[in-house]
Amino acid sequence: MSANLKYLSLGILVFQTTSLVLTMRYSRTLKEEGPRYLSSTAVVVAEFLKIMACIFLVYKDSKCSVRALNRVLHDEILNKPMETLKLAIPSGIYTLQNNLLYVALSNLDAATYQVTYQLKILTTALFSVSMLGKKLGVYQWLSLVILMAGVAFVQWPSDSQELNSKDLSTGSQFVGLMAVLTACFSSGFAGVYFEKILKETKQSVWIRNIQLGFFGSIFGLMGVYVYDGELVSKNGFFQGYNQLTWIVVALQALGGLVIAAVIKYADNILKGFATSLSIILSTIISYFWLQDFVPTSVFFLGAILVIAATFLYGYDPKPAGNPTKA
């Protein structure tokens, strides 16, 4: 049963991530009158939707009893403040990570950023080994290195994108490099820390998602105030929202639920593979649908490497002859 849930959750993650990327691209390219929707507010609304969905799922698990739901929420969240506070750590780190990536993008050329940021694949594996005691074989480590290279090639910027930042100073590039490296380590730690909480405590995935969403909403509202406070006060929180925007928000909320399920029933490393495959899938669909991407030989090389790495990670060599104990 758990194996079925693992592959089902990974499949849904690929579908959700691909759909989200495509709808986000499409929604941001539409030319409409009035202001565009603010991505910072969309993140907050998605967190609230995720919380509401999780409360409904807890309600369903409580045999559709409002009294039982209130008891579960009271016992598992209000009566366990320290357990709830544990989720402030990954939520805060994710917020910090988003800010670090903004600094990195402002101080690095696109190619350096894309290649360096793929180190998060290896940092996730390192934290999985050190914090969860996960054992990886030689083929699995090799597949992670190949995956890192493949994703970097798939997302390699075109010549027109590279022309933007040729005159960056050495000091500026150092700041950008430190920012992206810190983001890589924080991403790996936060993901594995959340996995450790999900797998080593008795609270359900939905309760943990409510706790994570609570802190995510707080940090998200802080982000709205800092980055878009002036625009919100001028045009409103829901400026630019339309039917497509709500689809994007709903997909983001679904992503939070699916990622938690993937981490619970699979792990962060497999999540990385699923996300990498969705990058390729969304890019190919984008070429045919949105026509905003022209595949290059570098992209095809990266796609081959990602697919090869995926198969290599699952490769389990049969011991020949008399097996020896490690």
UniProtKB/Swiss-Prot annotation:
Q: State what changing residue 47 to Q does.
A: Completely abolishes the biosynthesis of GlcNAc glycoconjugates
The entry's localization annotation reads:
Golgi apparatus membrane
Pfam families registered for this protein in UniProt: Nuc_sug_transp
Impact of mutating residue 50 to R? Severe impairment of UDP-GlcNAc transport activity
Q: What is the effect of changing residue 47 to D?
A: Decreases UDP-GlcNAc transport activity
Recall the GO molecular function terms of this protein's record: antiporter activity; UDP-galactose transmembrane transporter activity
Instruction: Name the GO cellular-component terms.
Output: Golgi membrane
Question: What is this entry's stated membrane topology?
Answer: Multi-pass membrane protein
Q: How is it modified after translation?
A: O-Glcnacylation regulates the stability of SLC35A3 and the specific complex formation with MGAT4B.
Q: Which GO terms describe its biological process?
A: UDP-N-acetylglucosamine transmembrane transport
Q: Which residues form a coiled coil?
A: none
Residues annotated as transmembrane: 4-24, 38-58, 136-156, 174-194, 212-232, 243-263, 269-289, 293-313
Main localisation: Golgi
Keywords of the record, alphabetical order, are: Antiport, Golgi apparatus, Membrane, Sugar transport, Transmembrane, Transmembrane helix, Transport
Catalytically driven reaction(s): UMP(out) + UDP-N-acetyl-alpha-D-glucosamine(in) = UMP(in) + UDP-N-acetyl-alpha-D-glucosamine(out)
Relate the protein's function as given in its record: Transports diphosphate-N-acetylglucosamine (UDP-GlcNAc) from the cytosol into the lumen of the Golgi apparatus, functioning as an antiporter that exchanges UDP-N-acetyl-alpha-D-glucosamine for UMP. May supply UDP-GlcNAc as substrate for Golgi-resident glycosyltransferases that generate highly branched, multiantennary complex N-glycans and keratan sulfate. However, the exact role of SLC35A3 still needs to be elucidated, it could be a member of a catalytically more efficient multiprotein complex rather than function independently as a single transporter.
Quaternary structure (record): Interacts with SLC35A2; the interaction is reduced in the presence of SLC35A4. Found in a complex with SLC35A2 and SLC35A4. Interacts with MGAT4B.
What NCBIfam families does the entry give? Answer: nst
Quote the protein name from its UniProt record: UDP-N-acetylglucosamine transporter
Which species does this protein come from? Mus musculus
